[in-house]
């Protein structure tokens, strides 16, 4: 018997969709050859900052703002379903200017979010550990969530509503009579609908020409440091790195942007570059404890917008290509996909996110 919905991918997007669908009464199975949050999600700092990620007005900013507005209620609901706390804070971001030219650019940034320009003295009064800077753009609505922790909670919440998880590697998707068949390393699974949330591996699985080409892996390395200096309380965003203060006192420093294919190695060069950038912002960083480095392959598209919506193959739905914004866009993506599958409702945004938008280019 075919399962109603099979989701390929147990990262934050796949697990968010699984929880949303199962909470609406849909029987869902999720497959991945890695553990929950075992891919790009485990190397995410979980930043929720649409006004930095998309300074210029456009669809990405609109999507980010919509999704951020869902976060408070979403986290409360997921935590309640899963029965576990989730580290989630909204301390704001300080986008740091190190020189006068960058400061002038930031002063002109008026893309919403109630940004406030702070001069050097005002910025350093908020964050005394900062080094030599010109000032910062302060957005109070921004925050972060512990992405692996959230994804584990989403999986647990989905299971609470009846979803099942299976560790297996999906190899291809086929159309068989009235349903889809996903061939895995441990056998075939038939499904009425398949949601492809496989991130950088989308092209190898897609099964139709629409999305086989556009999604490419971009390596991101993320450091965790044991901070020994004055407390850092807000997210710092510099020209070459960002720094996220965690509840345990450690700092996450990210992230490299490397077009190296499917190479998931941590590198000396990546670690060095991030440490140099972090210590330019926080000079006492050289005295921090090096705790670990994580690596993830972020799924990017040519226009930096995700692929969300129906594929060329009947019954196939895409939810992939979120690049640096998977955590930010997770609640909105889950809602868009669930509305499409359960109610047949097509949000206007899906037209711009359609997987077929690159078909004429490939």
Feature map (PLM): residue ranges:
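Helical element adjacent to the flavin cofactor pocket in flavoenzyme catalytic cores
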Residues: 137-193
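C-terminal catalytic lobe of FAD-dependent flavoproteins
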Residues: 147, 284-362
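N-terminal Rossmann-like FAD-binding beta1-loop-alpha1 element of flavoenzymes
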Residues: 3-29
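Dinucleotide-binding Rossmann-like beta1-alpha1 core, especially the glycine-rich loop
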Residues: 46-126, 277-279
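Helix-loop-beta segment of a Rossmann-like dinucleotide-binding subdomain
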Residues: 84-95, 114-161, 256-260, 320
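Active-site substrate-recognition segment that forms the wall
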Residues: 16-24, 33, 46-47, 84-89, ...
